[in-house]
Amino acid sequence: MAGSTPAPHGDGPLVGVLALQGDVREHVRVLEGFGARTRLVRQPKDLPGISGLVIPGGESTVMDKLSRQFGIAEPLRAAIDDGLPVYGTCAGLIMLADEIVDAIHDQRGIGGLDVSVRRNAFGSQTASFEVDLDVPALGAPPVHAVFIRAPVVASVGPAASALASLDDGRVVAVRQGALLGTSFHPEVTGDLRFHRLFLDMVEDAGRTL
């Protein structure tokens, strides 16, 4: 994964994928499958021209540290404040949360989503699981969701809305305006309705940095 030149796929919007760490390629493949163009984003110079951004799953503490080392954290927060559509999956949701209730060391994330999250809420990777989720915003059938060392949304503030919850009531998908977050990994299941929803959000926003 080298360079930040848009991939020659489709003529849709140019969507960045934060490429500091995590399952970057999977998101690129899904986005390009929908006809979007993609750009790997690591530094502030990679932001101008994109119409949306995906923050992939991975290790949130590593991603947080690298985002500051590469100088992308503050410009990205400014872009979010300016209305850039962003979709965060798993660690990406943690990065978007305004509060990380069990943050370690100086972990801060980027923020923007009016939620608090709890890291690794379901235990270690051996405790990963799959479940079908009812997501009214996406209609039938249920979304088959894969949770891998996943966070959970501990609380949803007044600016955000829950899109999906587990049977025990724990929230695992949220939206706030142009921001979208899921605890799980739609990019690995073949059910790509959350990516389609995000691209619709990008189109509705109709903006570029």
Swiss-Prot record:
Q: Which domain of life is it from?
A: Bacteria
PROSITE patterns, A to Z: PDXT_SNO_1, PDXT_SNO_2
Stored Pfam families: SNO (PF01174)
What catalytic reaction does the record list? aldehydo-D-ribose 5-phosphate + D-glyceraldehyde 3-phosphate + L-glutamine = pyridoxal 5'-phosphate + L-glutamate + phosphate + 3 H2O + H(+); L-glutamine + H2O = L-glutamate + NH4(+)
Asked if the record carries the keyword Lyase, the reply is yes
Q: Does the keyword Hydrolase apply?
A: yes
Q: Which UniProt keywords apply?
A: Glutamine amidotransferase, Hydrolase, Lyase, Pyridoxal phosphate
- UniProt-listed InterPro entries: Class_I_gatase-like, PdxT/SNO, PdxT/SNO_CS
Which Enzyme Commission number(s) are on file for it?
Answer: 4.3.3.6, 3.5.1.2
A single cellular component GO annotation: glutaminase complex
Query: One GO molecular-function annotation for this sequence?
Result: pyridoxal 5'-phosphate synthase (glutamine hydrolysing) activity
Q: Which residues form the active site?
A: C90 (nucleophile), H185 (charge relay system), E187 (charge relay system)
Q: Where along the chain is L-glutamine bound?
A: G58, E59, S60, R119, I148, R149
Q: Which GO terms describe its biological process?
A: glutamine catabolic process; pyridoxal phosphate biosynthetic process; pyridoxine metabolic process
CDD domains, per this entry? Answer: GATase1_PB (cd01749)
Its pathway, per UniProt, is: Cofactor biosynthesis; pyridoxal 5'-phosphate biosynthesis
Q: Which family does it belong to?
A: Belongs to the glutaminase PdxT/SNO family.
**What is this protein for, i.e. what is its function?**
Catalyzes the hydrolysis of glutamine to glutamate and ammonia as part of the biosynthesis of pyridoxal 5'-phosphate. The resulting ammonia molecule is channeled to the active site of PdxS.
PANTHER family given in the database record:
PYRIDOXAL 5'-PHOSPHATE SYNTHASE SUBUNIT SNO, PYRIDOXAL 5'-PHOSPHATE SYNTHASE SUBUNIT SNO1-RELATED
The UniProt subunit note reads as follows: In the presence of PdxS, forms a dodecamer of heterodimers. Only shows activity in the heterodimer.
The protein in question is named Pyridoxal 5'-phosphate synthase subunit PdxT
Protein source organism: Clavibacter sepedonicus (Clavibacter michiganensis subsp. sepedonicus)
Upper classification of the source organism reads: Bacteria, Bacillati, Actinomycetota, Actinomycetes, Micrococcales
Q: Which gene encodes it?
A: pdxT
